[in-house]
Amino acid sequence: MNGQKKNALGEIVIVGFALFSMFFGAGNVIFPPFLGMEAGSRWLEGFSAYFIADIGLAMMGMFALLRVGSSEQVLRRAGKLPAEILMCAIVLCIDPMVAIPRTSASAYEMAIAPNLSGVSPVVFSVAFFALILVLCLKESAVVDIVGKVLTPLLLVGLFAIIIKGIVAPLGEIADLPQISNVTVTGIKAGYQTMDALAALPFGIIILQSVTAKGYKQGKSQLRVVGGAALLAGVLLLAVYMGLAYLGATVSTQYTGSIGRAALIMAIVEALMGKTGVVIFGVVVGLACVTTAIALTSSAAAYFSELCRGKVSYKAFVAAICVFSAVVSNLGLDRIVAVAAPVLDVVYPPALVLICISLIMPKVHDFVSRGAVIGALLTSVLCTLHTYGVSVPLVEALPLYDLGLSWVLPAVVFGLAAQLVTMLPSVRRREEPARRAGEKN
């Protein structure tokens, strides 16, 4: 019994480390310092809002899929076909079309270019995705590779930089923030990372890995994955808070005119000199590799399952790596221009389904579909308005300034659907199915 508990604890640490790396990514390292710089003495307030809207929603996604059993079950409340369309759009837009190519571009910009200026970006991207291909080929080993090997190195580098910045701050923290509303800025920055969507594809490989190690559905799986999610959340809290504080310590030296990547590079160089730039390059490189591994593996696993195994996991890994290498060199901006509005549309209904799965898993599917329709209609109108089609009505909706204008329509449509389920005609039609379920 003690041996089983010890093994479970070890798995929690490994899976938790893997989840940390998956959500951390290379892009997210640049946001907390910039927010800390803008917020000045109110950096903790801005950071808290950012963390809740980013990692808070992402952890909700993890616990939602854990509660109902899988990522597919979270989305299936909207109906089988809508769920497949929604999941396919999420995986395509988050993984091979945007995030995976961006990992290579970020690694080159922040890790290679400052330290090895003579390396061609084309040659680097080919080498980068060749490495990702090799590390992703064994599906069941992905979580172990990330959790046991790469994440500890990543954490050592991150905490070395953060601790140096705490022990020897770079300057005084500005009394007044550079932005008008610190909390709103933090919420918008966290929400716009869309990390909650990443929980759905990441959940695929996490649950596969845990199940393959003998932790089946039930309390054992809940203990391992739930504990891992909490560990990842604590690590992300510590790292993001530390980075936000570093940004606050230079709030009297820089303004919003500096780029996000330039700010973190300037902080690292001021703290640790050229050695720090090299260490940070290693940190960013590891973050890019771990994120690319997670995204590639989860996308390949999903599409292989969608094809009912007719196309193998390894074939999809190879295809995704080749496609991402091409996109990272030839057309990332164009692909992002296509994918960004799609993500703007699908994010609100996906969040609705995550919240319902976590908070009200036994609610009638009519209610879920009603809430999804309300969120989807609003997100379509808001996206059209954002991209040049005038829909002035959406600006009058509550929470529009936060990007959360879909919340009220989702609630209203969900309540309307709940009233529909109470109609006598609907109850009579569902009575036979309910009785059959009780007998089983």
PLM regions and their residue ranges:
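Hydrophobic, membrane-embedded alpha-helices of multi-pass small-molecule transporters
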Residues: 14-24, 163-170, 179-246, 279-288, ...
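Helix-loop-helix connectors at the membrane interface of multi-pass transporters/channels
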Residues: 35, 105-120, 211-212, 292-319
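Membrane-water interface regions at transmembrane-helix termini and the short interhelical loops
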Residues: 37, 65-74, 129-150, 212-215, ...
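Selective recognition of specific alpha-helical transmembrane segments in multi-pass small-molecule
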Residues: 56, 60, 153-164, 227-251, ...
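TM-loop-TM module centered on a large, flexible mid-protein loop between adjacent transmembrane helices
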Residues: 72-73, 239-289, 305, 341-343
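Membrane-helix boundary/coupling elements in multi-pass transport proteins
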Residues: 99-104, 277-308, 372
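Membrane-interface loop-to-helix entry segments
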Residues: 137-165, 339-351, 370-377
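A generic transmembrane alpha-helix motif of multi-pass inner-membrane proteins
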Residues: 161, 168, 365-440
